[in-house]
Amino acid sequence: GFEVDFDRVLTQMARRAPGKDKTATPRKEKDLPKVLSGMLGNKLTGAPLCAVIENTNTKSGDYGNLLDCPRPGHSDYTAFVKYNASNDIRGGGHFSGRLTAPIVFAGAVCRQILESKGVKIAAHISSIGNVSDSSFCPTEIDDALIEKLNSSSFALIDETAEKPMRDAVEDARMAQDSIGGTIECCVTGIDAGYGEPMFEGVEGVIAKAVFGVPAIKGIEFGKGFEL
């Protein structure tokens, strides 16, 4: 019976959608989810929530050369070995970064449910290359900052970091290279006591989900790497 604000869901989908500027993939997709089940009149019904996000800008022929020349750092070669050369190379198959679209859809719905219980989530670009943004205050994060970050297409606490970050991405692009970065995420309004011992702890469950996003190579909680 929870009522979903679908416009807010679409706002989050638009933030993820590619093709908006040079810091993202040039492929253009609207990322419009079509709900098949689990929602009636914007209210969750209790049935499994299922939506389809169609690919509209497809050029399958562009991937033909990857059968003989796999992309460095991508799944092409490992998928070739794992599936005995039967893998679908078009668009990366089920290893494609496009699969972050359904993650964003599910997250946008879950975020609204959590907010109704007083739990708020936000994230920002912490660094790109050697350019860094300011960090969250470890003791107090106000709602205005959370709202600002959640509506931004290039989420930063210190907006003066945007230009040097974009310049770093552009320099890497012109050099036909890539560049790494980090994201800092905060959760407010949650009580202690969630999770289970050992393998089902909150950090372990979150880490498993985060590593489902392509290109993630590390995660820390609090000041984990600095201690």
Model-derived segments and their meaning:
Residues 1-227:
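Generic N-terminal targeting/processing segments that precede catalytic cores or assembly contacts
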